[in-house]
Amino acid sequence: MDGVRSLPLFRRYFGDAFPSNSNLAIDLCKRGGVSKTSQLIHLGCGPGTVSSIVSSKFGCTISGIDSSPNLIGAALTEWKRESLNFECAPLNKTPLTDASATHLLTESRLSVDRNPSQILGETHRLLSDNGILMNSELVVTNSSLLDENVNRFLDTIFGQDEDRSMDGWVNLIEANGFDIIEAREERQIMKANRKKLGRAMVGFRLLQRTGGLSLSELGLGALEDDFNEVVNSTLTAMDDGLISYGSFISRRSRA
């Protein structure tokens, strides 16, 4: 699923920060106390657009890390400057030194990783004592009410039996060496995403019919036969608030 973000078509429909957005990233940085003296790591920075906006807004130094060579290539071409650097590396094994950041921002990267504890472990290593983690993630408010098709789709992304409720995220973050400062559901983010997804599906269905889009290439081959039903059920779940979004601010505990 991670490779989907580098597709030009995906970026055209959803933007560079999906399923988050730049406004939420700025808000998280404000709430997390980012300032011009901060050393911020943006884990899963994509093509660097949000990193550049945050750097300009707060005047801080940012190290952006992403596992996609294509996205890092775009970031280096479009945004690299003295206060903004980008490197391609796995999010759970970066080349950065221990305790090199006062703040770390990551947007939905835990949501789509089958072992988010590994990324949280790397985050703990990268942050200094009392460093601040600011992350935003997909949230399932009540999985028992979801349509079977939606649960299959979410299992494809999250893995089976993962608790992605607000409480589930809090428990996961705290279990990996962080103290939660604030956890907030961001319903307006998912409302905006629902509109984007609805518009995008018109184009995606056309491409699928004409052979221009292969779900297997996107890691969604298991949904090929029921794609329309899955999409419609997912849109309904978003309308009903069963699929939402959340933001979290936490402090690194001492090792």
Where are these regions (language model features)?
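A short glycine-rich, Lys/Arg-flanked "PGG" loop and its adjoining helix->strand segment in the class I
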Residues: 117-132
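A short SAM/SAH-binding and catalytic strip from SAM-dependent methyltransferases
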Residues: 103-115
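A short acidic, Gly/Pro-enriched loop at the edge of an enzyme's catalytic core
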Residues: 92-104
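Conserved SAM-binding loop and adjacent beta-strand
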Residues: 10-27
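Conserved Class I S-adenosyl-L-methionine
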Residues: 184-255
